[in-house]
Amino acid sequence: MLVSEFDFHLPEDLIAQEPLADRAASRMLALDRSTGAWQDRMFADLPGFLRPGDLLVLNNTRVIPARLFGRRAGLRTQPGHEATGQVEVMLTEQISEWEWRALVRPGRKVPVGESIHFGNEGLQAEIIAHGEFGERTLRFTPIPDFFHVLERVGHIPLPPYIHREDRPEDRERYQTVYNQQPGSVAAPTAGLHFTPQMLAKLQELGVQTAYITLHVGLGTFQPVRVDKVEDIRLHRERYTLSPETAAAVNAALHENRRVIAVGTTTVRTLEHCATVADGKPLVPHAGETEIFISPGYKFRIVQGLLTNFHLPQSTLLMLVSAFAGREAVLAAYRHAVEQRYRFFSYGDCMFLA
């Protein structure tokens, strides 16, 4: 199968640059997997598509202010090297408690062994390695409350298709209301529509909720660079399946209740965990996944999906196509373009079941 088979025309002005004033005011395109029929609805209508006993699984990761601006402390091995140069660092993946992979600009001017100072709260890191693909490995000097300092010093890393600088309000709006575990450099965007009021309403209707954690990396924005779907390889992302969520999913499957995933990150986590379990009940654990889901994949857990609209020829569009059929999904996307739905992170959503 060719990557080009997942292309569609998307006018630039449909890419949402700002969040709506009310995060729950998004439109929702509902797609029936069994018939391919769709309905133009609102996210507020979601309760009407769920049933008592459904298990709604959400990703409780928190986006960290991963974009840092600092100054080089000076190159120790080259006397006279400029010591005041500005450096931009984008944290991409936590390796250990104090070590991170990162993109550094201008990378060629920041060699191994040089330190970078960020702000005036004691946050500093040393470049300890160059990666194969241009990334750097940083080791931060241990400080108390690292993530709290990062919150004050760093900037929210908005996606590359949002053509503006981050603003203070993005610290709230580019987070889900139920975020708990810091570690992502991109939001699990399907969850951005939920409010505490919506979650409470679903609970009143008998819909159960559970949470996984998958820390989203910058790889989610990388374009596909191969021609064949079979040649695609995904980046690794860290996830955690808690005892409570493993038990909730096992119970739902045993009792023939639907498991509804909020977002593709939740789909990938649950389906990866099903692969690990190999036909047995899920067991709580943490690990890394690089699962790639494309048409032909047989879903083991997920029976419903809430997701935003995705990039043309992207692996996430392939996942949605695997879930509901490529032709049906692309037809729904063409309809969404005609009806001027808002696309991508701050955009509208789809419900597929």
Curated annotation (Swiss-Prot):
The keyword Transport does not apply. GO terms for biological process: queuosine biosynthetic process; tRNA wobble guanine modification. Pathway: tRNA modification; tRNA-queuosine biosynthesis. InterPro entries: QueA, QueA_dom1, QueA_dom2, QueA_sf. Its EC number is 2.4.99.17. It is found in: Cytoplasm. This is S-adenosylmethionine:tRNA ribosyltransferase-isomerase. The lineage of its organism: Bacteria, Pseudomonadati, Acidobacteriota, Terriglobia, Terriglobales. The gene is queA.
